[in-house]
Structures are given as structure tokens and as C-alpha cells.
């Protein structure tokens, strides 16, 4: 009986944490994200940073579901799904790159996966859904990405595992 009570209490505490996560990652909504790069040759610049192994970012403005943020930093995300030969590469977007504390609903980093190895577009979002039932895990949903006014495609939008994630899920960033 004691063990059952402990299980119910800890499960309830965990579920409360999960339910309080940002509505930004609700799976019943496809987010709309517009990136407007400062430079016309943004793809060449990002390809160059990637090939050279540089950790730098290039500047863009971003509109997320109608809210606009300026001077965000953009780079490619990851390694295995990035290629200078792909038109649709994954993106890591830092909202507070130049403007301190700039965020969208408390989120300061967007991670857009290109889903290049998942033709169903289901695996990543579904696996995070399952994981969150048993342990802390990132939230994920979908976003249509527009670049300089052109629809670039459907991406998965995955919550970054950063200090905010650690504090929300474990009470400390350490």
C-alpha cells in the first residue's frame, strides 16, 4: 500500500509538471514560422559556416504565429541530417542572440528538424509523446517554415534541452 501511494504521488507530481508545459508545443496545432534573413545569400553563408565547422550564426528576423522578433541568430542544427546538397536543412534559431531576454512564450531557442530520415513525419513527435508519459522529455510538434516568403516545408519543432528545461523538469540546472 505504501509503495502504491508513493507511486501515485510521484506520478501525479510528474504529470502536473508535464501538463504545465508551454502551449507552444501542443501537437494539435501546426505552428507557422517565417524567417527573413538579412543576407540574400543566407544559404551559402550557412553552408560555409557548416563546412568550416564554425559555430557562428547569421542574422534574421522571425515571425512565430504572428509575433515578430528581430536580430535572431540562425545556424544549421545537428550533423547527420545536414548537407550542403540538401535544400531543406534543419535549423537552430536563437531568439536572444543579440537582444537579451527576447523569447516567445518563455522559449529562447527553436530547434526545427527537417525529418529527412522519416517519410511518415511521425516518429520524432510520437516518440517524445511516449517518453513523456514515463520520464521528462522534450516537447515536440510541427511547424510550417517560410524563408523569405517562400514555404520551405514542414518541420518538427522540438523543445531544446537547456537550463530552462532542466529547471522545469528537475528543479535545478545542474
Predicted region positions:
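Bacterial Sec-dependent N-terminal signal peptides
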Residues: 1-21
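Phosphate/dinucleotide-binding and metal-coordinating scaffold of catalytic cores
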Residues: 19-174
